[in-house]
């Protein structure tokens, strides 16, 4: 069930990236938790149009949109949502998670960078600093267009 939900979230993100345009845009990553404090779903929102476009959101609105999307897509039982990262900047973003031990709860992080590789490395470094060396994985990646976006995202 979780893999199905994550697949849908990734597909949704891919659609947003395909229709993306330049301009100052907000993005946010949201995680949903059940009554036991275990994460059950994660998604993100990134504006697909520049300021003034139909899908433009600033950082605050992107946070609200990510939470709404999470609640629509999440399975029943989500009792708490958390925005683990949000910004109004241009760049690549990587959402990752890992664990400190076999039965430990997942630790969620978001890395930002000028390339996919930089964003992923920043996310992995955050996991390492938090001691989450087990079951590390990059869950999804996206590119957030900002005011200084002069070129499409690199394919690194």
Predicted regions and their residues:
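Bacterial N-terminal signal peptides that target proteins for export
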Residues: 1-11
